[in-house]
Regions:
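Conserved acidic catalytic loop of the alpha/beta-hydrolase fold
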Residues: 86-95, 99-117
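Conserved alpha/beta-hydrolase "acid-adjacent" motif
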Residues: 252-258
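Conserved hydrolase catalytic core segment
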Residues: 115-157
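Catalytic active-site module of serine/aspartate enzymes centered on a nucleophile-bearing elbow/loop
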Residues: 268-291
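Short beta-strand/loop motif that positions the catalytic acidic residue
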Residues: 239, 245-247, 251
Length: 291
């Protein structure tokens, strides 16, 4: 399958993207989550969508992968205060928010001269999708939200076993091998117990991601963008386009109740709960999601 790679000037920054399928076919824009490069939309998953008759675009969000790193922006103050405020649905001062990342999406579509697209977001990408679909309904044909949240008050937080490695990282001075091992361990913790990857597969994926880009400071800013935005509920309720919300029963990072909250707040949204799916996209769930 041919992949058209490029860098888009969007919202004052550069976004690396990959564009697949016939440019005359209906476009699907895939938005990935926290600390996740575009490669975490598996190529096989994208190929299924192309074979189904779609043009597929995946891209690196700001501060990740090959897109612009906003290293001049600094996060100040204790993160636990922002985390507690976020649990109450309250915003906090941060370098940028999910609103800025939604503007990146608009800029990418403008650059590619795509008037409207089917927009699918995973995790933080699903949060960006909610903001974008509410603010720019004319740019959205339909909405897909995978293991995400409204971030409204009193939703269950991540399990400590999933949150701890996300917050702590591999540690200062970690070697490349230690960084890769930490990434593989984290992917196993949040992964789908019904559709597990082998250790060799996880190490290979972590190695590929590390070789492409490693920028932990950008992940910190992305995480604070989530915390600083506050509740999305008032945006979620404004989504009018056909919407499917997909969540796994075994997600330890963004709990199933969070996906259910999204579906409750979007008129006529369809909720799909996948048994044994965690916070990843293993091949065993691709057919279910793409259909």
């Amino acid at each position: 399958m041919d992949i058209r790679r490029g860098v888009a000037e969007a919202n004052g920054i550069e976004l690396a993207y990959e564009d697949m399928g016939d440019v005359l076919h209906p476009p699907i824009l895939l938005i990935m989550g926290l600390s996740a490069q575009l490669t975490l939309w598996p190529l096989g998953f994208c190929e299924l969508l192309v074979k189904a008759g779609y043009r597929v675009i995946r891209f690196d969000n700001r501060d990740i992968g090959l897109s612009t790193k906003l290293s001049h922006l600094k996060v100040s103050g204790p993160v636990w205060k922002r985390f507690l405020r976020a649990q109450l649905g309250l915003p906090s001062p941060v370098p940028y928010t999910l609103h800025d990342m939604a503007e990146d999406v608009r800029g990418l579509l403008d650059f590619l001269q795509i008037p409207s697209a089917h927009v699918v977001g995973a995790s933080m990408g699903g949060m960006i999708t909610q903001v974008f679909a509410a603010k720019y309904p004319q740019r959205v044909r339909s909405v897909g939200i995978i293991f995400s949240s409204t971030n409204q008050p009193f939703l269950p937080p991540p399990k400590p076993s999933a949150l701890k490695p996300l917050m702590s990282g591999p540690g200062k001075g970690a070697t490349r091998e230690q960084i890769i091992a930490h990434s593989a361990k984290f992917m196993r913790i949040i992964g789908s117990p019904k559709y597990p990857f082998t250790q060799d597969e996880l190490i290979a994926l972590a190695t590929e991601m590390n070789a492409r880009s490693y920028h932990p400071a950008g992940v910190v800013r992305q995480f604070n963008a989530i915390l600083g935005t506050g509740s999305l509920k008032h945006f979620t309720r404004r989504i009018e386009k056909p919407t499917v919300v997909i969540h796994g029963t075994a997600d330890p990072l963004v709990r199933p109740a969070c996906g259910k909250a999204i579906a409750r707040n979007i008129p006529k949204a369809r909720l799909v709960i996948i048994p044994g799916m965690g916070h990843d996209l293993p091949p065993g769930v691709w057919e279910r999601i793409t259909h």
